[in-house]
């Protein structure tokens, strides 16, 4: 909501959607993937709108890409089980279409009260790192920009990317 957006702005940070909109070519078309993921889920934990992550397919300098941005307004960008599923879908789209993928990282890591539900099978969190390696072997460019918090499991994405950028004063 608005108070959480204002809190991000007070820290000198953009929201996930603002970051993506700033990055993508303004005059080109883009589409958000899974905007309603997480709708009505995890209400006992305060909810997880959009799965806590924003995914868009759009163009950067005329090149079609997948952009994934943690939403720090949702539990400080922590990963819920649906967050992992949405990230996996973004990677799947990138692999199927051989599109570069850009991760805008601002995450407190796994949401600890639900960590037992994030790692249990091959279609969960650990699969993301397998996909990183697979995309690397396929020659699919992966770029990470650390925009804010980058701890625990969330720190592996930048390490496994082809390039990692750390934003001065807001990244940690």
Model regions: which residues?
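Terminal-region recognition feature
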Residues: 1-149, 153-156, 160-172
